[in-house]
């Protein structure tokens, strides 16, 4: 499973990129709205120049014509921009348009296997099931990942599954085991993946032994 980072904060992206683990970035209107003094297109351009992999930029229009117009503008920013579309009839209409043009798409706000299958058949490059939000309403988000992965395998579907709405490190592990191709993970959760008390205790022990030896 690959790691994407789910943020529009350029400093967070730069730090995670330096770790050598990032394969892409996802953004959405809510994340971009938190960033000040930079336009949406300029921020996507900055990210796309730094990160070689897919950079998802989401449309805001609700009609297919508007989505297509916005998506073409986003795709023109850089060759690694992926147009992010909502799971609606208009979103799938736009998805098919972009698929026919060879433009990558990420269909977001997936909450059922049927939605994922429809998006895949509309030509989506990626589908993004929201596991945390499903957990919030008492459903099993990771189980949905597994169902979609099984369905795609049975029917030889190439669309990749992005585990989204990732809340904690356990979501990352579970998504990987369930068959997600990618986890798009907030910066806070990515940093949490580093930590284990035995790792930190081991580092402290090595340093203590080394400093003791130096003092002899």
UniProtKB/Swiss-Prot annotation:
InterPro entries: Aldolase_TIM (IPR013785), TAL/FSA (IPR001585), Transaldolase_3B (IPR022999), Transaldolase_3B/F6P_aldolase (IPR004731), Transaldolase_AS (IPR018225), TSA/FSA_arc/bac (IPR033919)
Reaction equations catalysed: D-sedoheptulose 7-phosphate + D-glyceraldehyde 3-phosphate = D-erythrose 4-phosphate + beta-D-fructose 6-phosphate
A Pfam family annotated for this UniProt entry: TAL_FSA
High-level lineage: Bacteria, Bacillati, Bacillota, Bacilli, Bacillales
Protein name stated in the entry: Probable transaldolase
HAMAP family per record: Transaldolase_3b
Record: active site: 84
GO biological process: carbohydrate metabolic process; pentose-phosphate shunt
Database matches in Gene3D superfamilies: Aldolase class I
Function description: Transaldolase is important for the balance of metabolites in the pentose-phosphate pathway.
A single cellular component GO annotation: cytoplasm
